[in-house]
Amino acid sequence: MSGASNIKKEPEAGEEVLSAAAMKFQRHYPATRVEISAPDALLMIPMDIILIEQVLINLMENAVQHGKTTTQISLRLTRSDDLAVFEVSDDGQGIAPALLPHLFDGYLTRDQEAISDKRRNMGIGLSVCKSIVQAHGGAMRASNRPTGGALLQFTLPLEETSHEDQRKSTPD
């Protein structure tokens, strides 16, 4: 992904992308329960719905494939100021703390591979997810939940901003 100009964004309902991703995921992982939480008010988000849906599916697949004990995944959408916040959390084993700083790098060192216990492919998929989110003007992060399991979160701007708009809003 070379930049946001390659992404065709249309205003889409956030809860619809969550539902579509969950439905496609559950075709392949019917034993994993997926819970969806979204605001009551319709949240329209400028996005390439196919790419964002793929990010959500990839995050859910990683939760099952690498969480080992994952039986439930929660998809949550909230609004924080001018951002849509997407969260994918699970009840699996979580992410090894040594991997967290490098999770989106796209590669793992031999030591990190040993820690990750056969998670070599995870980094490549997550680096692509991060590139897609960044091309939309968003950010991505990962952490472990205090109650167990992993939490992967990404944000997308709620309004389309051009480079010209950004220059106008920057004080001289």
List each model region and its residues.
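Conserved micro-motifs of the catalytic ATP-binding
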Residues: G3-I7, M44-M47
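Short alpha-helical Gxxx[C/S/T] motif in the catalytic ATP-binding
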Residues: G125, C129
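Short helix-loop "hinge" at the ATP-lid/N-box region of the Bergerat-fold HATPase_c
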Residues: A63-V64
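Conserved catalytic submotifs in the C-terminal HATPase_c
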Residues: E10, R33-L43
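Acidic ATP/Mg2+-coordinating residue in the GHKL
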Residues: D90
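Short conserved segment of the HATPase_c
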Residues: I95-Y107
